[in-house]
Amino acid sequence: MNAAQHFIVVKAPVDRVYERWSHLEDLPKFVTLLRDVRRIDDTHFSYSWHPNSADQKGVFHIVLQIPGRRIAWRTMSNGFMSGVVSFEPRSQDETEVTLKIRSIFKPPSLSHRVEEYLGNFKRLVENGKDRA
């Protein structure tokens, strides 16, 4: 199993940072391979993504959600991938965001992509723009 983990410090309070990430339909704004995320029910979401120039669809399941602290998920189709994002207040105005992704796929760029997604998310939150 391939895994990557990185963290970044976002200049915003933990509640605001968590709230922004927890709007899962907005993931494509900073996870560049995702094209669309739609809520199926409280814990299931459909998604489409564009790896290697080929559109694919799948479903992911939220397996753990601790408000203000952590969100964990796993895919239900198209291979196995799981992830967890955690939010730790560093101060009133700074939050450490840690993202860990595990996958049966072995993309050489998984570590780079995790860093990229966190950087995109940081810009989205700190700049208040709709797209990172």
Regions found by a protein language model. Name each.
Residues M1-H44, N120:
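Hydrophobic ligand-binding cavity/cleft-lining segments
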Residues A3-Q5, D55-V59, F80-V84:
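Short, surface-exposed coil-to-beta transition loops
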Residues F7-K11, R38, S48, H61, ...:
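Generic structural detector for well-ordered beta-strands
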Residues A12, D41-D42, I66-G68, Q92:
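Residue-level signal for tight coil/turn positions that link beta-strands
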Residues T43-W49, A54, I66, A72:
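Ser/Thr-rich, low-complexity intrinsically disordered terminal regions
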Residues N52-Q56, F105-K106:
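Short, cysteine-centered beta-strand-loop-beta hairpins and adjacent loop/turn segments enriched
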Residues H61-L64, R70-A132:
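Beta-strand/loop substructures that line and gate deep hydrophobic ligand-binding cavities in soluble
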